[in-house]
């Protein structure tokens, strides 16, 4: 307490004393110029007084004020010497200026030692803070003094900025929260014409707790200078396919990578383009101009990444003109830091009048960043061994920040979220990321304590404000050797990458879209197309067939591989049904089906069992009813041949019947007439959920109730294909009536043709008997068997149940493929069915026929009335 009281008493005295000394000094300079001998004496006296003030245990704010006054004393001397250099007495002023800079540098170096010693003896935390703050300010002054010496005293020599850069970097290390050292480094970067390095340090001087006041203007000046400079590598006709980011249209130019590191053509062309592309997020510009700049940037980036590992590492050096001892892949790390600041700056922009513009800029930034980082991941995969890739530190930093970025974007309103281009870019990045993650070994999904050690890249970006939540979890105090080189801690870096990726997979925020998934059992990463799953392909990361593609139609996944079960997506995805799994044979793609598009409307109810004949008939009748097709022809079971045209897949369960036809019977379109028929194929999987699906996209219809008829009437299959399900329209269904599908594209029905609502099969039979006497049909027998249990599945196709009066059915004239047009569209369904016998000829020229339904009733009536020999268990196609 007594020491503090003494310091408080001495403080006013020292301040008054130094104030008086400075008054005498400026009076002497103005009267006798700065070259007078008394000037140096008064300067030394003022310096010693300031030393005493720093030892008086001032408050932090007071130390800032005193330190500023001390630097102002030196800066006034520097300003006077610069004025003298313009006079006739140039040589004397130059000599005196050089002497003053040397004395001033020596003064600050001694002051650092004295301040550290004084505050170290205090043994207080506040004393340590004051010491670090003052030393950081003194290092900045030392850097400025050295910079002036190189700038003014070595005008005819090649300046060496390494000493000044070393002081600035030491200042940043002493007090990371200050933006002043980085602003000074940005100034040095402009001296060596390194625009990317200047951009990086301008960003660092802004994205800290204590931003440098003039850094914002310096950043804008840097962008304006870049805009005004012509760039030879900027192509006015360059284009980029945002919906296919992995596409590389331009060929890599031949580059002489044997040149000096600082003269690499790829680097000279690339880095100014990065600055030009970044400027669009800070200066008002045309989006068309951005497209050309970005396309040119990606072209040069591809060219740079085409270099081998040695030349790539040399290309990524950043401080070769400022500090030759500072080595590492700084360029790519600086680009990632700039990307992070872009999102940080956009998030802080407020104002409803610019919301739309900010949304566009955000999506544009997402597109740019994820495409560039996708290229980074691609290049990492080409490095052997993988842990030696110089791009991995930048990838780790980006993965650490990625959960915060995705959460920040998804916090916006619905219209502010990802657009088509940004979704494509994000999917591209994660698709490449999965490849590199699955090459690494996941030792422990819970990040061990040793992996929380700060690595080289963490020390480099320490105090970058957007990364503060991440740095708070890292240990910067131990294992300081890790900060020396990016080559150290390779194993820790790989484990950190895996840990960051797992953190991305565990994002549980409500409404957030998941881009990456992790299988805990197999320690395997996989990705899915998320909200776009109904328009394309899914990648599965676990199971026997991981990383294989499967076709997705609506909420059900159909995997065209035998005995392979799919992995349902995580709970975040909206899955109506678990995937149905093939148990016997893979789907067959006949030449007949491949010749024409396959409609997505080929659907059957999940609550019924259908015969393969019905499945094939239903499939063939709906060919061409919707727009999407299997464009690859479905020639084999290779999943790579399954391609769906984008944006046309209905969000409905597919027709499984179309996939289960027998291989041997599906060689041709007219295989229904061949012996032994098409046997049923067992399907396993939950099917009860099909009941909840709606019949029409715009109108909900209740499920058709069905009661078994009396024994005297024939039993009807639940999927009777002779009625149209739309009870509101009451239109007759003709397999070749294309207008129905053209008017209602994309409508999916759980029953292809459910029974007419409101009338039972018994009532139909009664009405039919009253209107027409049924004569017994000609007898027939199933070939080779007396058991009709599986007649429809395995019975004779020569004597079809659909053939009129039991006559053999010619394969070329199968009634399934030549349906009747029963009546006009304006008639109601009841009128059509009641007057069916009045039909004479249809527009297709076919003869009068009571139709497949009435023939079916006649034949089944005959079966019920004739002997017990033919009676057996219900046929397989009846769902009894």
Swiss-Prot record:
Disruption phenotype: No visible phenotype under normal growth conditions. Residues 669-711 are annotated as: Disordered. TPR repeats lie at residues 149-183, 184-217. Residues 691-701 have a biased composition (Polar residues). Keywords: Repeat, TPR repeat. It comes from the Eukaryota. Pfam families: EST1, EST1_DNA_bind. May play a role in growth and development. This is Nonsense-mediated mRNA decay factor SMG7-like. It comes from Arabidopsis thaliana (Mouse-ear cress).
